C-alpha cells in the first residue's frame, strides 16, 4: 500500500514584465498547484512494482477449439495444476471461460496449453478480452492508491485497480485504471465519475482497450493545459512557453462547435519521457497573468483525438445534473401559471421581502423588468390584495351563484346557514309566493303525533327538492328557479332528502303521507277529511286505530297504485252481498229451540 504524501502549496508569484524569461527566472516564476516532496528510492520501487503487478494481473483466460461433447469436468482435469475460481463451458461454441487465481497462473496456462491438442483437436488459449476497463484522469497528484480504490470501489467488484507513477520521481501522474468484473458496473462508474469535482479538479473518465494497452503505453504523451488567461487565443505563445525543453508535435486550443474557446489546450510530444519533462517544467508557469496548470491526459489516443474527447467530456460535465430539455424562461413559467398565481409570485418580494429580508422565487423586485414603473407596481399591488381578499372556492369548485347578479340571488339560502354543531336548522320560513314545505308530510307525522305513534323525535324540516312531473300538484306546476337545479347545493339537498324519505317511509305507512291541500296522486280527500288511500283496512280494523308494530316485525311499504281509481273499489265490487240482520224476536226463537244437554250432564245427585 502506498504511503500518504504531504502537500505544500506555494503562493503565486507576480510575473516580471518587459524582460526575457531565462531558465532561472522561469523556475522562480513557477507556482504549481501542488508541490510534492521527493521520495526515497525504496518508496519509488514499491510503487512501480505495485503498478506492474496490477497491470499484469489478468487472470481470465479463454479456451477455444474444444470438442462438442466436452464436459466441465474435463476442463477441470485439463487445468488440474492450477487453481480455478470460475469455469463455464459453452458446448455449442466449443469454448470455455476460466478464471484462475492470479495473472501468473493465467500466463503459465497460456504458455502450457496454447496450440495443444485435446481429442485430436487443437486448442487456442489466450486472455479474455475485457470491455470493463476505465481510465480515470485529472486526479490530484497527491491522491494515494488507497484513496483511488475508495473512489472507484463503490460501483462494483474490482478486477484491477492501480495508479500510474513516474519512473523517475515515483510521483503519481494524475490518472489510474480500474477494471470491473462486469461491464454494467464500469458503465455506472463512468456515468457517476465523469465531471465529478475532486478537490480543485474535475475528473475525466474514458473507456480503454485492454488489448492495446502495454507497459510502455501506460505513460501518456499528451498534456492538458488549463487555467489559461481569459480570452487567450495565441497558440504560438502557448507553444513557445511549453517548448523550453522539448517542442510539441501537436498544440491546439479547445474550441466548441460555435467557435467559442473552452479555456484549455492539448499538446502532444514525441515520447512519454519528453511529455513528462515538459510537464515538470511548465506546471505553474506564468502566462499572461495566470499560472498554467499542466497535467497528463489519458494514455493511448493521439493529441487530436484526445482534444475532441476532452471537449465532449467538458460538455458532459457542464450539463451534469441537467435535464434533456432546455430550462424555461420566466415568461414561459408565468404563462403556464394562472393570473392569481402569477401576481402572487411577482408581488411576493414586495409583500414579504421588506419584513424578513428574503427575496422571492424570481429574485429581488428591481431585477424584474415587469415592475419598472411605480404606477404599474401600485396597480399590481392593489390587484393582488383584492385577489387575496376573495373567497376561496369550495371542494366542488366555484358556486354557480357567484356568477349571478346581486338582484338575481334568492332571498333565503337553499339550506340556510349551518350551526356550529354541524346540524341542520329546525325550520326554514317559507318564501313569499311559494307553497309550504312538503317534506314533513312525505316523511310522516311530525311533533306530538310522531311521539304518540312511537316513531321517535321529529326530524328537522328541509326545503323539498323539485317534485317529478307525475307527482306535482297544482301548487307546484310553476317553473322552478334556475338555481334550484344543477348547483352543488341542490345535489346535496336532494341526496339528503332521499335518504331521509327512505328511512321514514318504512315506519310511517299507517300515517297520512299527504298534505292538507291534496292527495299524493292528485285526488281530492274524501268527505271524512282523509284521503282515499287510507281506506285500506289492515286486519279488519280501521287505520285510525292502528298502532305501531313491534320492532321485531318490520313492515314493508305497500306498492302505490298506478291509476287514479282507488284499488279498494275493485275489491269491494267482487265481495258477495251480506244477509240482513235478524230481529230480536227471531233471535229469541232460535235460542229457545236450541237443546240444552249440557245442563243435565253438569248436575250431580245429592
UniProtKB/Swiss-Prot annotation:
Gene3D superfamilies: 3.30.70.330. The modification Phosphoserine is found at residues 6, 14, 474, 562. Residues 453-462, 592-606 have a biased composition (Low complexity). It is found in: Nucleus; Cytoplasm. Residues 59-130, 132-210, 221-299 form the RRM domain. Residues 1-41, 391-474, 519-564, 579-606 are annotated as: Disordered. SMART domains: RRM. The keyword Acetylation applies. The modification N-acetylalanine is found at residue 2. Cooperates with PTBP1 to modulate regulated alternative splicing events. Promotes exon skipping. Cooperates with PTBP1 to modulate switching between mutually exclusive exons during maturation of the TPM1 pre-mRNA. This is Ribonucleoprotein PTB-binding 1.
Amino acid at each position: 500500500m502506498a504511503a500518504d504524501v504531504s502537500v505544500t502549496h506555494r503562493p503565486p508569484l507576480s510575473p516580471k514584465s518587459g524582460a526575457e524569461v531565462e531558465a532561472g527566472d522561469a523556475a522562480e516564476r513557477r507556482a504549481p498547484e501542488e508541490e510534492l516532496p521527493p521520495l526515497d528510492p525504496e518508496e519509488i520501487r514499491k510503487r512501480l512494482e505495485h503498478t506492474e503487478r496490477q497491470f499484469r494481473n489478468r487472470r481470465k483466460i479463454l479456451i477455444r477449439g474444444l470438442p462438442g461433447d466436452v464436459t466441465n469436468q474435463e476442463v477441470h482435469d485439463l487445468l488440474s495444476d492450477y487453481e480455478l475460481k470460475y469455469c463455464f463451458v459453452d458446448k455449442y461454441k466449443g469454448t470455455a471461460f476460466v478464471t484462475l487465481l492470479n495473472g501468473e497462473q493465467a500466463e503459465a496456462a497460456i504458455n502450457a496449453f496454447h496450440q495443444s491438442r485435446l481429442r485430436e483437436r487443437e486448442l487456442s488459449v489466450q486472455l479474455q478480452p475485457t470491455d470493463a476497463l476505465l481510465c480515470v484522469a485529472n486526479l490530484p497528484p497527491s491522491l494515494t492508491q488507497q484513496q483511488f480504490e475508495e473512489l472507484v470501489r463503490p460501483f462494483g467488484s474490482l478486477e484491477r485497480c492501480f495508479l500510474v507513477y513516474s519512473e523517475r520521481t515515483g510521483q503519481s501522474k494524475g490518472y489510474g485504471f480500474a477494471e470491473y468484473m462486469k461491464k454494467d458496473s464500469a458503465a455506472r462508474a463512468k456515468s457517476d465519475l465523469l465531471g465529478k469535482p475532486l478537490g480543485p479538479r474535475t475528473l475525466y473518465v474514458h473507456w480503454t482497450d485492454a488489448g492495446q494497452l502495454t507497459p510502455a503505453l501506460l505513460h501518456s504523451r499528451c498534456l492538458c493545459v488549463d487555467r489559461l488567461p481569459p480570452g487567450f487565443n495565441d497558440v504560438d505563445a502557448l507553444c513557445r512557453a511549453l517548448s523550453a525543453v522539448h517542442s510539441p508535435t501537436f498544440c491546439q486550443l479547445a474550441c466548441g462547435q460555435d467557435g467559442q474557446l473552452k479555456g484549455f489546450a492539448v499538446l502532444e510530444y514525441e515520447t512519454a519521457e519528453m511529455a513528462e519533462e515538459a510537464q515538470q517544467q511548465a506546471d505553474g508557469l506564468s502566462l499572461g497573468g495566470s499560472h498554467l496548470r499542466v497535467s497528463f491526459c489519458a494514455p493511448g489516443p493521439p493529441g487530436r483525438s484526445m482534444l475532441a474527447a476532452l471537449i465532449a467530456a467538458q460538455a458532459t460535465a457542464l450539463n451534469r445534473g441537467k435535464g434533456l430539455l432546455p430550462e424555461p424562461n420566466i415568461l414561459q413559467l408565468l404563462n403556464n401559471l394562472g393570473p392569481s398565481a402569477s401576481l402572487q409570485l411577482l408581488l411576493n418580494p414586495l409583500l414579504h421581502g421588506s419584513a424578513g429580508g428574503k427575496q422571492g422565487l424570481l429574485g429581488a423586485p428591481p431585477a424584474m423588468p415587469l415592475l419598472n414603473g411605480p404606477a404599474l407596481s401600485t396597480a399590481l399591488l392593489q390587484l393582488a390584495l383584492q385577489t387575496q381578499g376573495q373567497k376561496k372556492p369550495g371542494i366542488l369548485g366555484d358556486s354557480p351563484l357567484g356568477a349571478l347578479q346581486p338582484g338575481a340571488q334568492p332571498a333565503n339560502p337553499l339550506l340556510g346557514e349551518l350551526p356550529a354543531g354541524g346540524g341542520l336548522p329546525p325550520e326554514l320560513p317559507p318564501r313569499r309566493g311559494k307553497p309550504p314545505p312538503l317534506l314533513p308530510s312525505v316523511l310522516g307525522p311530525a311533533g306530538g303525533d310522531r311521539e304518540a305513534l312511537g316513531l321517535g323525535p321529529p326530524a328537522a324540516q328541509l326545503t323539498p327538492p323539485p317534485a317529478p312531473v307525475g307527482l306535482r300538484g297544482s301548487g307546484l306546476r310553476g317553473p322552478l328557479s334556475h338555481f334550484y337545479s344543477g348547483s352543488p347545493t341542490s345535489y346535496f339537498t336532494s341526496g339528503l332528502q332521499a335518504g331521509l324519505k327512505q328511512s321514514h317511509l318504512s315506519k310511517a305507512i299507517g300515517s297520512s303521507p299527504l298534505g292538507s291541500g291534496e292527495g299524493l296522486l292528485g285526488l281530492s280527500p274524501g268527505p271524512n277529511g282523509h284521503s282515499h288511500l287510507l281506506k285500506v283496512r289492515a286486519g279488519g280494523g280501521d287505520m285510525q286505530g292502528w298502532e305501531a308494530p313491534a320492532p321485531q316485525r318490520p313492515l314493508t311499504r305497500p306498492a302505490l297504485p298506478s291509476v287514479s281509481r282507488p284499488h279498494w273499489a275493485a275489491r269491494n265490487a267482487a265481495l258477495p252481498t251480506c244477509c240482513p240482520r235478524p230481529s230480536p224476536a227471531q233471535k229469541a226463537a232460535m235460542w229457545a229451540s236450541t237443546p240444552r244437554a249440557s245442563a243435565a250432564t253438569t248436575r250431580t245427585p245429592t
